[in-house]
UniProtKB/Swiss-Prot annotation:
Secreted effector that dos not suppress the host cell death induced by cell death-inducing proteins. Residues 1-19 form the signal peptide. It comes from Plasmopara viticola. This is Secreted RxLR effector protein 115. Its main location: secreted. Belongs to the RxLR effector family. The RxLR-dEER motif acts to carry the protein into the host cell cytoplasm through binding to cell surface phosphatidylinositol-3-phosphate.
Length: 447
């Protein structure tokens, strides 16, 4: 009996080794005590079938000597459950969890890379809006320019500048308000007949330029070009416009009353020190609009050359500019505005065309400072008094009208005005006397 037990134990060991060799080592995992017992039972069943197969062989005398129906006892009777400590199980669980987390991270990275490559391969689509194709980008990585604080720095980075300029800031503000991207080429506008009732939208670059011209910070960005002769003449015409719309048709029945109301209105606005709005009123004739407030009228001869030099981008006024200023101030007239802007005075003593009341006010401003004017009420008689005063001045300075003859004997005796290097000659004196008698003007004043 002892020998039979020894033989059975030896066969059990051999069968266990053979069964272990047949199992796949990659699929065996010891997770709990139940799995261990399940593996032991499967080993027992395999061993039992192997023993029965060996007992059918005729050469096995040892097994045939005993009872053929006798089988070894169940291994659960002499095998005990393996006790695994909790620390070992916790360590195994941690190792398994870390491995799963690393695998998940790697899978997410691969998925993101695949998504980015797939977005880059997708071609941009186009939409038909009211018969026009409008390109739309499918790249979702590029977000809309809708943040005012970050967009200027992005634009500055693309232009390789250190700080954001005023144009970039205004472009960011326009993008935040309208919330749309730059339209592609050949489809930069959306017609007003679109189904979604969208108005015509210009590109952000054009809107930024328009905003920057109106609200620019650095005025040196917008430089004025050199002016031509026609532009200079137009500039004089702008300066020669009356300061206030005061053209009145004398044939109107209520012209005097309307004029007094206008003057009282101007006097009240002057006391309040407010800007007079350029609201034209139709009183028989069209009223010319006043010039812009930033363009001060050229009233002083010394200031005209410097104004022209600044407008023509010159450091100092030239001789032509000085002569033009001298010509304007000596003859005391301004460019006559075109159209029905003159008042024909139907008086028997004078047939001259009088200037506008605004030009008369400018003439007074040449002689008296605006702050020193008397603020008493301007009546109609005062207006006609100013007109008569201007008539007298116009008669003495009119070029196209012959003045009253004057005795030039003293001028003839003194002779013409000569330079220090010139010497008076008899012929020069004769020419001087002839000019005085013929043109009724001194020789040195003849144009």
């Amino acid at each position: 009996m002892c020998g039979a037990h020894y033989v059975a134990i030896a066969l059990l060991v051999v069968a266990g080794s053979l069964a272990a060799a047949e199992f796949d080592q990659n699929e065996i995992q010891q997770t709990s005590d139940d799995d261990v017992m399940a593996s032991v039972n499967s080993t027992y069943e395999l061993l039992q079938s192997r023993i029965l197969r060996e007992r059918r062989e005729p050469k096995d005398n040892l097994l045939s000597a005993g009872d053929e129906e006798r089988t070894p006892s169940s291994p659960s009777s002499f095998l005990k459950e393996l006790k695994v400590s909790d620390s070992i199980m916790d360590a195994a669980n941690v190792i398994r969890t870390e491995g799963g987390a690393s695998a998940i991270d790697a899978a997410l990275k691969n998925l993101n890379q695949l998504n980015r490559k797939r977005r880059q391969r997708i071609a941009p689509t186009s939409k038909n809006v009211a018969g026009h194709e409008v390109g739309t980008s499918s790249d979702t990585d590029k977000s809309l320019v809708s943040v005012e604080n970050e967009t200027p720095f992005v634009l500055a980075k693309r232009r390789r500048t250190k700080r954001s300029a005023a144009m970039m800031t205004n472009a960011a503000r326009s993008a935040k308000q309208h919330d749309y991207r730059l339209a592609p080429t050949e489809s930069s506008t959306i017609p007003a007949k679109a189904p979604d009732d969208q108005l015509n939208k210009q590109p952000i670059s054009q809107k930024a330029l328009q905003l920057d011209k109106n609200e620019h910070v650095d005025e040196s960005l917008w430089r004025e070009e050199l002016m031509t002769v026609d532009e200079v003449l137009h500039l004089f015409e702008e300066f020669d416009k009356p300061a206030h719309p005061t053209a009145v048709n004398l044939q109107e029945p209520n012209a005097i009353e309307t004029t007094s109301k206008k003057l009282n209105h101007l006097r009240r606005n002057k006391r309040k020190r407010k800007h007079i709005a350029s609201t034209p009123k139709n009183v028989g004739q069209l009223v010319r609009a006043p010039p812009l407030s930033d363009k001060s009228p050229v009233l002083v001869a010394k200031g005209i050359p410097f104004v022209l030099a600044i407008r023509l981008k010159k450091n100092h006024p030239t001789a032509i500019m000085k002569n033009a200023a001298k010509f304007v101030t000596q003859h005391d007239y301004r460019l006559t505005p075109s159209g029905p802007s003159m008042i024909n005075a139907a008086t028997p003593n004078s047939q001259l065309k009088f200037h506008l009341l605004g030009q008369k006010a400018l003439h007074l401003d040449k002689n008296e400072h605006a702050g020193d004017l008397n603020e008493e009420s301007h009546t109609v008689e005062h207006i006609f008094h100013l007109r008569e005063r201007n008539d007298k001045l116009a008669q003495t300075t009119a070029v196209n009208q012959q003045s009253v003859l004057k005795n030039w004997e003293a001028e003839i005796a003194n002779g013409p005005l000569l330079l220090s290097r010139d010497r008076p000659d008899k012929m020069v004196k004769e020419i001087h006397a002839a000019f005085l008698e013929t043109f009724n003007l001194p020789f040195h004043q003849y144009p």
